[in-house]
Amino acid sequence: MASDTMTVAALSRPFTLGMFYNAVKDELIPGLTLWDAKTLKDNTGENSQHSSDFQISTSDTTQSKSSLLNIEASLKASFLAGLVEVEGSAKYLNDQKRFKNQSRVTFQYHATTNFKQLNMADLGTLDKEQQSIIKRSSATHVVTGILYGANAFFVFDSEKVEADSVQEMEGSMRALIKKIPAFDVEGKVDLKLTDEEKALTQKFSCKFYGDFILESNPSTFEEAVNAYVGLPKLLGEEGENSVPLKVWLVPLKYLDPEVPELINEISIGLVIEIEDVLDDLRRMEARCNDSLVEGVVGDFPCLQEVLTRFQKLCSYYRADLQKTMVKILPSIREGKEDESSLRRIIEEREKSPFSHEKLSKWLDCKEREVNVVWACVEIIPDIKFVANQTELEREVLAPLAVFSFCFIFTSLETADPCLDNMRNYLDGEKSGSSEPTYISDDVLNQMTDKAYTFKKVENDLKGPKVKFFVAAILNKKFPGASVYEYIGGNLHYGMAGCCGCHAGSASLQFGINPQQCHQQSAITPPPPCFKVGIMHVETIRSPLLRRTKTQRVVPKISNFDSSDQSTNFH
């Protein structure tokens, strides 16, 4: 019998001695028991097992979290599939980093108090009524032993930081959080921090998951220290407030041979594969959050919409995987299916639009696009954003807007076949092969060139009757970015061939005299034939990465050629 005894993590579930358990679905069966309360009490032994310790983790994987809670592979598979609903400290399993570029340090307090076990040998054989109770249930095991205690997790998360600062921030946080036990002096808080440590605590927050009832959950480092120091008292002098931590289960087949038994368990290797897939999908969602909180994304609803859509599709796919696992796992344990049916689902992912390679490539392209948009906006700061074509028209038709120039991102609203394939796959439709839509290196470099030129034009022509805007409006004819020039509310197509873009140069030619520009009537637009000069902007291109420095050369104004009457944005 000892060799068939199972041990499972309680995960803050309300286990009691003599309770039924269905190991096929990893679920408790409350309300049914083979013995009355007096019989259970008379046949229960108890031993004191007082202990406490703490651990620190900087990992956010399911593997590291389940290790802190001593969860074995089979129960982990049930949790990953959604068969097990966790409570108390085990809710920590569901807590994920919001951002990829975020430092996280977790402090765990673990305590044990006592162990209770049921003496099965003294309970005798079952009568017909007890056998009938077993047959009416779906139980496979009975609870015969429980280790009591409590867990508490203090999860410290930094604010979003730059990618190259994550490790440094994590190291600083870990060094400080490791000192928490030292702040407990005979049950009282002695919190002495340096100015540097005090400044550090302002850069991260705290979340609490525990088997303790606190007056209020801590949200700061100081509150976390105060809560930690008071935890031992909350267990009670005799551990009366402790909860089940670990449970021992004996198969019911030893009491009734007709009880269905657990035939197979999920292999550790397969559980790790499932874990990796689900963690990978969550990391993709976290990468999306990194981009979504960028200020420039909030300025462009089209960027926000496509990132949110990608994030939701990944979430739907993850839920779909879990739904399938809920059906397959019990069948494998009952011997009705083998592991190949579950492994096949994992393998199919790599052929689907949700493969790691395809999702990562899509995000790479989108993050690069966000970086370039950010770079352009940084070059032309303080320019008014207009949400769409309608708002742009309203601005350029305003009475005071004699001249209007709008820097247009022309490719942000392009349809995305990758997202369409993801949606079709979830709907059960066959997906065609597709590559992420991305803007070429040449176009990306031209976008920043045009932004520098636009900035030079703003500096030279700004005045009460000259307006400048930024917008995202689809225009497939000019990929990347373009400049729209309006005079008296009219878009001048002759000026740079509809919206002013010719690839390969950063020079700008305008048929507008700055002095005359500011003297013009707000009602009568000027003739578009004035020509005062050709302004050139030279740039030294550097890799288009977030927060990298862009080298710039001071713009030069070339000599004016009066014979050239064209107006072009090359």
Kindly give the residue locations of the regions a language model identified.
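Intrinsically disordered, low-complexity basic segments at termini and long loops, enriched
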Residues: 515-569
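Membrane-permeabilization and membrane-interfacing ectodomains
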Residues: 1-333, 424, 429-439, 443-446, ...
